[in-house]
Amino acid sequence: MQNFTYWNPTKLIFGRGEVERLPEELKPYGKNVLLVYGGGSIKRSGLYDQVIEQLNKAGATVHELAGVEPNPRVSTVNKGVAICKEQNIDFLLAVGGGSVIDCTKAIAAGAKYDGDAWDIVTKKHQPKDALPFGTVLTLAATGSEMNSGSVITNWETKEKYGWGSPLVFPKFSILDPVNTFTVPKNHTIYGMVDMMSHVFEQYFHHVSNTPYQDRMCESLLRTVIETAPKLINDLENYELRETILYTGTIALNGMLSMGARGDWATHNIEHAVSAVYDIPHAGGLAILFPNWMRHTLSENPARMKQLAVRVFDVEEAGKTDEEIALEGIDKLSAFWTSLGAPNRLADYDINDEQLDTIADKAMANGTFGQFKSLNKEDVLSILKASL
């Protein structure tokens, strides 16, 4: 294992009806609150009214930033920052999925900075302070409710980058599976692809002696594989929603990567794709990940074989490690397709016209990837295989 320090200060509040804990959780942070949410689904589901009721009980003055995009824009972040400064906001409350939470993290840091929030995203400025914030989660997917990472898009420059700071861990996150009942089938599928992709990014490394980390990753993957087909046919099943909600959080709260840094190359490529074409993040991952795996297989066939055998139950007899690994990759792709996820860029009407532009954006900070360091030719090869 590699040396590591694990620290995660987010209080996780999980279960039915736990939004009623809001007044108590808000007490340490002040009463001037900015409520951040997306396109209005929380109003249709009734969650908005529940949250407002609890904020009123807390005696909070509520300001709102609505309309956070699925790939949150820095322009929206800057709107939130302006509200925070004009209204002397004490606390931010993100009610939504990962995009809303990611946007809120950037607002929290940007509110304590005099420049453009894009400076924080591009790491030109390292945050020295941030407003406190909490979350009420409505989508099992990103794990942003219990980590310090965020992904923000600049639509004007067609750039999309991940950033993070220990200052932007949520103070608390409230996870009620009931609040995910109204998530439509396609977004439920995307969420499960996303959390599996997070596990894969942490699974693919060359560090020796990580048996427990490996088994945690494999257990999470098998749990999603077992649960997903049931859930997409029973969207209001509490226990199935509960399982996936918890799994999504554990997939990216830092536990899986203790002692072994993961890869994250596929996410970097997908960020470049969705910066140009604004496609769903997890849809891009479903297309790219199997092709990244095929492209990098020769780096560590034993690792890919282990995944194929332990997670996808590939039979070993009479096959080479590479054949076993490739069968596992095919099973992954087939599984995602069976759920309804896309498997070609053509599914989003993406052709080869802008592949070079996408590759250049992926290479903005030079070669990347821990499992295999990718250059532009590698990226183009993966993109072409994904058409």
From Swiss-Prot:
<protein>
    <recommendedName>
        <fullName>Probable NADH-dependent butanol dehydrogenase 1</fullName>
        <ecNumber>1.1.1.-</ecNumber>
    </recommendedName>
</protein>
<dbReference type="InterPro" id="IPR018211">
    <property type="entry name" value="ADH_Fe_CS"/>
</dbReference>
<dbReference type="Pfam" id="PF25137">
    <property type="entry name" value="ADH_Fe_C"/>
</dbReference>
<dbReference type="InterPro" id="IPR001670">
    <property type="entry name" value="ADH_Fe/GldA"/>
</dbReference>
<keyword id="KW-0520">NAD</keyword>
<dbReference type="InterPro" id="IPR056798">
    <property type="entry name" value="ADH_Fe_C"/>
</dbReference>
<dbReference type="GO" id="GO:1990362">
    <property type="term" value="F:butanol dehydrogenase (NAD+) activity"/>
</dbReference>
<dbReference type="GO" id="GO:0005829">
    <property type="term" value="C:cytosol"/>
</dbReference>
<dbReference type="GO" id="GO:0008106">
    <property type="term" value="F:alcohol dehydrogenase (NADP+) activity"/>
</dbReference>
<dbReference type="GO" id="GO:0071271">
    <property type="term" value="P:1-butanol biosynthetic process"/>
</dbReference>
<comment type="similarity">
    <text>Belongs to the iron-containing alcohol dehydrogenase family.</text>
</comment>
<dbReference type="GO" id="GO:1990002">
    <property type="term" value="F:methylglyoxal reductase (NADPH) (acetol producing) activity"/>
</dbReference>
<comment type="pathway">
    <text>Alcohol metabolism; butanol biosynthesis.</text>
</comment>
<keyword id="KW-0560">Oxidoreductase</keyword>
<dbReference type="GO" id="GO:0046872">
    <property type="term" value="F:metal ion binding"/>
</dbReference>
<dbReference type="Pfam" id="PF00465">
    <property type="entry name" value="Fe-ADH"/>
</dbReference>
<dbReference type="InterPro" id="IPR044731">
    <property type="entry name" value="BDH-like"/>
</dbReference>
